Amino acid sequence: MMQESATETISNSSMNQNGMSTLSSQLDAGSRDGRSSGDTSSEVSTVELLHLQQQQALQAARQLLLQQQTSGLKSPKSSDKQRPLQVPVSVAMMTPQVITPQQMQQILQQQVLSPQQLQALLQQQQAVMLQQQQLQEFYKKQQEQLHLQLLQQQQQQQQQQQQQQQQQQQQQQQQQQQQQQQQQQQQQQQQHPGKQAKEQQQQQQQQQQLAAQQLVFQQQLLQMQQLQQQQHLLSLQRQGLISIPPGQAALPVQSLPQAGLSPAEIQQLWKEVTGVHSMEDNGIKHGGLDLTTNNSSSTTSSNTSKASPPITHHSIVNGQSSVLSARRDSSSHEETGASHTLYGHGVCKWPGCESICEDFGQFLKHLNNEHALDDRSTAQCRVQMQVVQQLEIQLSKERERLQAMMTHLHMRPSEPKPSPKPLNLVSSVTMSKNMLETSPQSLPQTPTTPTAPVTPITQGPSVITPASVPNVGAIRRRHSDKYNIPMSSEIAPNYEFYKNADVRPPFTYATLIRQAIMESSDRQLTLNEIYSWFTRTFAYFRRNAATWKNAVRHNLSLHKCFVRVENVKGAVWTVDEVEYQKRRSQKITGSPTLVKNIPTSLGYGAALNASLQAALAESSLPLLSNPGLINNASSGLLQAVHEDLNGSLDHIDSNGNSSPGCSPQPHIHSIHVKEEPVIAEDEDCPMSLVTTANHSPELEDDREIEEEPLSEDLE
């Protein structure tokens, strides 16, 4: 019996083993089929999956029972070698399908699976379900993305097609418009074949009308210029300065060409007018002056001017004047002399231009291109003419003022003379070689450029009248406050002038500092407040370099009349009026003289003559600084001034020995002269020139203190 039971158990175990292997293989095959079916078709419903799982479980159970029944037929010999095996793990992995509770009970009763294996089976089943859900979601997302991409591609294709259609339509429309325009042009040409020719004719007529208007305007300008020239020559003839023969008359008004001149010829005529003036004015050298406006003081220009004969003007022959020949002569004179009134120091002197030109040829090109005969140039000429007229009015006022001064000083006034008309639109006056050769007593003079015309002076009694122009420039000048003339009387009427014009005020730094302190409310100012008063009151100190501040500090520290006081605000400066008035009285009671460091061989007449020359040269009046122009009246004026200051005329000859003929001229260059500018009396003339002097030997150091900082004004 024991043997039989043993054989049954062995057979059962072997059968179980064989049955389980077959079951596991079937379950694996079923799981593969299920997975493949799940992978291929994700659309199978859960109900169908459960149904398949139940069928597979039933088949597995049936096969297991059949194997157990047939296992008893096998021999038990194999049980010696084989041990009873438990259910393989593959049974748990057979399928992730849902198992019913009945099937679970049957499996537990038959002891096919242990509880642990069942738990693992359930976990795997849940994991597979999650994977299936994720796969389904992933497939859905991919389908949606593909669908969106397809829609986008379709939309892009549609847009491209629409754009292409629009472009094609636009091209067709443009082609149609071009065709229509061509057809219209052809029709117009067929209908109006001469319309274009008419338009061209109208344009030509308009151009001709403009040219005719310009010609008329230019002729008017030439007429005005010639009238001024005739008036000037008549005034000179009345004064007896020149004698005009009948054959050498000015250009008559009728000599203007009425028509038939091109703009180039008109421009040449315009240039010729200035050349005619410069050539005619060479004849005025008999009166002792050279009023040529050509800035040519070089040797080459003097040779050419000396070689060129005077130009004579004849009447018109066949409607054309002899101005063309004069133009050729003057143009050749300008080219050989390589100089021009409107050209100096490499800069174009045309008003408002100041273009840099490297050489004279480039200047001529610039002049012909930029300053051709047009509306702008003619307007600038009109402005320059107005400037000259204003300067002439100013000159007449200054002449009247000087005559009144001479009458007050018991001197013989000069005869009033009409102011000459300007010979050129550019008021630059120089000394030429022709003038130097005709007057042997004259000295060589460097060319300068004042801003006002100068009246001619004859050999008889005349008046030296330098024109006072606001923009003369910064010149070293001293105020005549030594003669008890208050500074406020000078600044008050000319306050706006000094505030806006770039003119150096004719006062010492000490006088200006005192005025600034006296104008303050508490009669004391700090250094910065003094600086502010300088820049606020005078435009000169605003627009120039601030080197004058060193001079202000220098005067504050060295003059005894300025006292430095310490207070809560800091250091302030006040004025000691007693010391200031004492300083003024010392200068007034000193021994004044006009000349310092004059050689003993020179007399007082030569000294006064030289001092006048130096003062005039410093005042930018080169024509008047010629000793040949200083006559007996001018020497008498100097004698009277010297008498008022010093009280004696013992060293001066009453017959006017201070004339140029009596004074040794080679020693003039070694003379050092102090020059004192005058106080302005009205706003029209803010500054005028009176040569006064004050030099005290005992106050030499004090004078140098005042004069040293003023040298910075010339920078």
Curated annotation (Swiss-Prot):
UniProt cross-references to InterPro entries, sorted A to Z: FH_FOXP1_P2, Fork_head_dom, FOXP, FOXP-CC, TF_fork_head_CS_2, WH-like_DNA-bd_sf, WH_DNA-bd_sf
Region (Disordered): 1-46, 281-339, 438-465, 649-668, 678-715
Subcellular localization, as worded in the UniProt entry: Nucleus
Annotated region (CTBP1-binding), positions in chain: 422-426
GO cellular component: chromatin; nucleus
Tissue: Isoform 1 and isoform 6 are expressed in adult and fetal brain, caudate nucleus and lung.
Coiled coil: none
Primary residence: nucleus
Keyword entries, A-Z: Chromosomal rearrangement, Disease variant, DNA-binding, Metal-binding, Nucleus, Repressor, Transcription, Transcription regulation, Zinc, Zinc-finger
Matches recorded under CDD domains: FH_FOXP2 (cd20065)
GO biological process, one term: vocal learning
Comp. bias (Polar residues): 1-28
UniProt zinc finger (C2H2-type) residues: 346-371
GO-annotated molecular function: DNA binding; DNA-binding transcription factor activity; DNA-binding transcription factor activity, RNA polymerase II-specific; DNA-binding transcription repressor activity, RNA polymerase II-specific; identical protein binding; protein homodimerization activity; RNA polymerase II cis-regulatory region sequence-specific DNA binding; sequence-specific DNA binding
Annotation: DNA-binding region: 504-594
Classification via SUPFAM superfamilies: Winged helix' DNA-binding domain
Biased composition (Acidic residues): 699-715
Acetylation is among the record's keywords: no
Domain remark from Swiss-Prot or TrEMBL: The leucine-zipper is required for dimerization and transcriptional repression.
Subunit-structure text: Forms homodimers and heterodimers with FOXP1 and FOXP4. Dimerization is required for DNA-binding. Interacts with CTBP1. Interacts with FOXP1. Isoform 1 and isoform 3 interact with TBR1. Interacts with ZMYM2.
Name of this chain's protein: Forkhead box protein P2
Name of the encoding gene: FOXP2
